[in-house]
């Protein structure tokens, strides 16, 4: 196998829990393939640089054939320089008693300068994935502060919800995850998201013919939407390894394409498809070819789906209005 030229992969919050699960898999080739060397460009806040150096020691000790180099910095202008891929993981977590507006404001202080730095120094074709929550609106903030980059460079992660939707359906039906196709997560990475099985198949047969409608509406949808809270409750910490795995899946499919006849869910800028307000970063069903994603068009939308899709869009509009008031987006 001939090796390609190394690509530059920037990761923020690199010394955190998700970063720790993510970096070794990128270095092992899980994200971009076994023939693609990578240069990791890791960003952390100044107090975490010492811990980050420990992670770098471990990365070097992994002796990964695909790991061409590792760069660390507390300056986004250094970490994002010529980046081909950027995974924005570092964010301000919600603390007890914090209102959504406070959280959006605190994250604006992170994602506005990061958007500006990406716009200034990243590759013009950079693929940006925002993992740090609230991911959709953080992605919007970064995107709006990088006007020189194509808006489609910016995406938000709903793949964790998508993977949760697959695994819950597999558990219920006794099928393997690989036998399930075309689940969709519409909207926000929040409890208003809509895990949609109307187009999904299990072993080639419609999913909704194999499960009870009451279970779907009253158990399945809330279980998928609130899974993150259930993990915090059980583990005493938020989902990190599964989030890292979903980030790998999202970037892998964006870089290398989706399988024929299948789609995945990505948070992307709405072009008005399915009546979703243009410009919102919203979870859609997408197919990817040659590194470009396209929304799957022409899917039937029932009244039930319409209500769910509009409710999560409304939440995203409210978040956008809040960050607009704070002067973080246009």
UniProtKB/Swiss-Prot annotation:
The keyword Signal does not apply. Catalyzes the reversible oxidation of malate to oxaloacetate. Belongs to the LDH/MDH superfamily. MDH type 2 family. InterPro entries: L-lactate/malate_DH (IPR001557), Lactate/malate_DH_C (IPR022383), Lactate/malate_DH_N (IPR001236), Lactate_DH/Glyco_Ohase_4_C (IPR015955), Malate_DH_type2 (IPR010945), NAD(P)-bd_dom_sf (IPR036291). The lineage of its organism: Bacteria, Thermotogati, Deinococcota, Deinococci, Deinococcales. Substrate binds at residues 94, 100, 133, 164. This is Malate dehydrogenase. It comes from Deinococcus radiodurans (strain ATCC 13939 / DSM 20539 / JCM 16871 / CCUG 27074 / LMG 4051 / NBRC 15346 / NCIMB 9279 / VKM B-1422 / R1). It is an enzyme of class 1 (oxidoreductase). GO terms for biological process: malate metabolic process; NADH metabolic process; oxaloacetate metabolic process; tricarboxylic acid cycle. NAD(+) binds at residues 13-19, 107, 114, 131-133.
């Amino acid at each position: 196998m001939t090796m390609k030229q190394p690509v530059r992969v920037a990761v923020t919050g690199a010394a955190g829990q998700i970063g720790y699960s993510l970096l070794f898999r990128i270095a092992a080739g899980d994200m971009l393939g076994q023939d693609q060397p990578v240069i990791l460009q890791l960003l952390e806040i100044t107090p975490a640089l010492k811990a980050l150096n420990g992670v770098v020691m471990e990365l070097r000790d992994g002796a990964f054939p695909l790991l061409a180099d590792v760069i660390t910095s507390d300056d986004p202008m250094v970490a994002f320089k010529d980046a081909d891929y950027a995974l924005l993981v570092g964010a301000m977590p919600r603390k007890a008693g914090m209102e959504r507006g406070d959280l959006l404001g605190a994250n604006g202080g992170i994602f506005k300068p990061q958007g500006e730095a990406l716009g200034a120094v990243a590759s013009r074709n950079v693929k940006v994935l925002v993992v740090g929550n609230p991911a959709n609106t953080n992605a919007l903030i970064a995107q709006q502060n990088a006007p020189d980059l194509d808006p489609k460079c910016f995406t938000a992660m709903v793949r964790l919800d998508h993977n949760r939707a697959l695994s819950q359906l597999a558990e219920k039906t006794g099928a393997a995850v690989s036998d399930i196709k075309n689940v969709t997560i519409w909207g926000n990475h929040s409890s208003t998201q809509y895990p949609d099985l109307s187009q999904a198949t299990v072993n080639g047969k419609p999913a909704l013919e194999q499960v009870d409608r009451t279970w779907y509406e009253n158990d399945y949808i809330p279980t998928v939407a609130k899974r993150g809270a259930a993990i915090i409750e059980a583990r005493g910490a938020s989902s990190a390894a599964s989030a890292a795995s979903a980030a790998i899946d999202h970037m892998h499919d964006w870089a290398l394409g989706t399988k024929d006849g299948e789609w995945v869910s990505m948070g992307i800028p709405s072009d008005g498809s399915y009546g979703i307000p243009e410009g919102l970063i919203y979870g859609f069903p997408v197919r990817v070819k040659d590194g470009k994603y396209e929304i799957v068009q022409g899917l039937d939308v029932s009244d039930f789906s319409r209500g769910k899709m509009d409710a999560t869009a409304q939440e995203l509009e409210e978040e956008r209005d809040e960050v607009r008031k704070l002067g973080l987006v246009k």
